[in-house]
Amino acid sequence: MECSTYTSSQPNLVWGENIDVEISGVGRNITEELRDVSGGKKERRMQRLVRKREVNEAGRLMSTARNESFKRAVSLYRAGAHLSSAMTTVSPTSIIHLFKLSPPNGRPRAQTRVRCSIAEGPTISPSSVDGRGTVDCVVVGGGISGLCIAQALATKHRDTVPNVIVTEARDQVGGNITTVERDGYLWEEGPNSFQPSDSILTMAVDSGLKDELVLGDPDAPRFVLWKGKLRPVPAKPTDLPFFDLMSFGGKLRAGFGALGIRPPPPGHEESVEEFVRRNLGDEVFERLIEPFCSGVYAGDPSKLSMKAAFGRVWKLEQIGGSIIGGTVKTIQERNNAPKPPRDPRLPKPKGQTVGSFRKGLSMLPDAISKRLGSNVKLSWKLTSISKLDNQEYKLTYETPEGLASVQTKSVVMTIPSYTASNLFRPLSDVAAGALSQFFYPPVAAVTVSYPTEAFRAECLIDGELKGFGQLHPRSQGLETLGTIYSSSLFPNRAPPGRVLLLNYIGGATNPGIKFKTHSELVEAVDRDLRKVLIDPRAKEPLALGVRIWPQAIPQFLVGHLDILDTAKSALRDIGFRGMFLGGNYVSGVALGRCVEGAYEVAAEVSDFLSQQAYK
């Protein structure tokens, strides 16, 4: 029996790791003890108990009490429930009830002492989730992946996974999603936007954010810096002939290569650079794909895996013999397959656009967390994982109230791979070693503002800066990876007459940025912008925010998928079925892929628990 099998009717009564059950020789009955607690010694006794409070393993504690005795103790406690209002007036408090128990088998009566703690805020007990002390799933990590997995389980798989909790080591949810609002500005210091796929739109609608969605102008141009000039990027392949970013010869090479007139695939896993140069030519790589890799992954395309980082494009060649052949085959298969009806609740974005929310991306994790309510546990740091004899898991946490343990049928680890590696080390060196191999380079998000008149005239359209933003190939000599025109992309991001720019700097090819000061990073960004976008004579920018992420974006390097499979196989080999890996190093780094991956993991958890139910 677990201590957490009893759930108090009082919502802030803590059971589980904060219950001590001991056999005691104290010869007083319940009425005497209650009289003592409520008398003049009340204050001193409460303070002494708080100071001496110990946290013990629930299983060890329960082994000291007979099951029948504990049941009788619980019954007596319920009979004294009228004390709950008095108990909640002191927080935190420990009150001891000494229950005089009748022997169930004629043996000398034992004395059971039950200590309860009154906690501030929501209960920390897992038993509060389902009343039994064992939950169906614990999602470790309250970033966007973890929250979306929990939301997907709650909305799509409630019948098979009714009881889910999310634990987050920090005091807030959202992971790298960080929205700041100040002095009329609203900016992001992590991800900036998302592709409005049906998955992320469903998540937004289910979270009550349909009316908060904002979508960018689908016609807003994207620019790449090439030879000192910002050049628009073709929005689709058919636009390629009409843009000056590439030469006529480069366009021909790309077209013939896409049709399959190019060298055959090699016998090894290709990097992004190898794949693109072979299929589409040098110009496409150098002027489009290389800056795109820098903008999305902050990565080095000579090391990124095409199969892992851009698997959908890689697969086209596999299924169709060429990029065009695979595209045609994919369209045919899609047209021939029965198409499920689209959720009528979802908005219909127009064209190639991006999305956010009226008050920034943080609205999504905040809304999901609010819907999950007390099932989201903040400031819960996972310290150990163990497998129980009944094939369930025991997770032990450091919490603001002390140690707490949760017993669960399944676990989804959405924390960064390097953190998961440390937790798995005592269980599997192979799994821990595999997860430790993933590389996260540093990236800094630098947000600045200029007045509209500070921009070069040739960069304005009808007197305004319009567009999504600009990317900078490494060969062009700028340190910043790219710049997003935040106030042009979404409304109400800056005061009238001001332009808000979000700049990313660092990445796999420039890891030294983590040693720079904030002022040095602002100077680097301003220096680069004056070479391209800002009038060199303009005044210094208003520096709003600098956020350095020391380990920002997992790199999907060559061998990434094999390493991930090694970690998963190692967990299966030690009997850790029901232990799932999630997060951006599994699903992909784009916000939309994190949400799509969340639905996929939720389905896997549901399938696992459904199978377990029939065993």
Language-model segments: residues:
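Mid-domain catalytic core of redox enzymes
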Residues: R113-R115, A119-G121, D130-G133, S374, ...
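Conserved flavin/dinucleotide-binding core of flavoenzymes
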Residues: R109-P126, D130, P234-P237, L465-K466, ...
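Peripheral membrane lipid-binding modules
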Residues: E2-N29, E33-R35
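Active-site/ligand-binding neighborhood in enzyme catalytic cores
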Residues: L252-T399, Q407-S410
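Dinucleotide-binding Rossmann-like beta1-alpha1 core, especially the glycine-rich loop
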Residues: D183-P265
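Glycine-rich FAD pyrophosphate-binding loop
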Residues: A154-R182
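A short alpha-helix-loop-beta-strand transition element characteristic
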Residues: L201-F223, E283-R287, Q437-Y440, I461-D462, ...
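Beta1/beta-strand and adjacent pyrophosphate-binding region of the FAD-binding site
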Residues: S127-S145
